[in-house]
Each structure stands twice: as structure tokens, then as C-alpha cells.
Amino acid sequence: MLSIDTNILLYAQNRDCPEHDAAAAFLVECAGRADVAVCELVLMELYQLLRNPTVVTRPLEGPEAAEVCQTFRRNRRWALLENAPVMNEVWVLAATPRIARRRLFDARLALTLRHHGVDEFATRNINGFTDFGFSRVWDPITSDG
């Protein structure tokens, strides 16, 4: 099963960024697949970013950002993943000396996805996800898949 990171979804929505066309094309390829899972953690982050004027030049209002996220939630072919019992593992990572603060968000997402059987992850942040047991982590913006 494949899942898609927030950064890919954001670039697909943001026509002002140079990655837009490639990200949007990747989502079009994925739209009809039945082996895609979207995680609520990713959608919550997408909602926040779509509304943030430091991230996008034309931030959305709450209802508009929510509708973007609902569009992904409504894809009948895609699985919708929520939480998983992964926080004990996340807190073990949190206690690791010199761990980057933001690493915990990626860890929680990765462990949640793996708990639900996701084995492939599309992201711009390849290095943040290589240590979690995915069979494939890749950047669909810079590679052909």
C-alpha cells in the first residue's frame, strides 16, 4: 500500500510553487488506484499549511482548506487511516539524545502508516522516513516512480 506525504499534497494544491505540475500529475496518477491510503495526520497538517500565510501566498480560509482535505477523504478508492497505538515508540525516540524536535512528527506519521500496512511512501523528505521499514520511500517530484 502507498501513502502520500503532506508536502506532495501541498505542492499539488499550490499553483504558485515550481513543484505544482509534477505533484498534481502524481496525484492524478494515484487518484484511481485502490492501493493508496491517506492519513488523517497528513490532512491535519495540510489544513494548517493551506491556511498559513508564511507558507502559501494565497492562504485559504478554514472552510476552503477543510474542503480541500475532505476531497482527499472522499476518494472511495483510497483507505483513510487514523491513529495507531504508536506513541510508546514515539516517546522512546523522543528520549534519544540530540534528536531533532521535528523528527517526532515524522516518526509518529511513519509508525502510524506502518501499523496500518503502508509499505511505500511518497515524500519530498526522503531522509526523514528511510528508517521506519518502508520498502520504498521516494520523491515523485524528481523521479519517474
Swiss-Prot record:
Residues the entry annotates as binding Mg(2+): D5, D106
Domain of life: Bacteria
Enzyme Commission code: 3.1.-.-
Keyword 4Fe-4S attributed: no
GO function term, MF aspect, one: magnesium ion binding
BP-aspect Gene Ontology terms: negative regulation of growth
Entry-linked SUPFAM superfamilies: PIN domain-like (SSF88723)
Keywords: Hydrolase, Magnesium, Metal-binding, Nuclease, Toxin-antitoxin system
Cross-referenced InterPro entries: Mtu_PIN, PIN-like_dom_sf, PIN_dom, VapC_family
Matching Pfam families: PIN
Cellular component, GO, one term: plasma membrane
Top-level enzyme category: hydrolase
Domain PINc: from-to ranges: 4-123
Cofactor: Mg(2+)
Family indicated by similarity: Belongs to the PINc/VapC protein family.
NCBIfam families registered for this protein in UniProt: Mtu_PIN_fam
Role this protein plays: Toxic component of a type II toxin-antitoxin (TA) system. An RNase. Its cognate antitoxin is VapB24.
Protein's name in the database: Ribonuclease VapC24
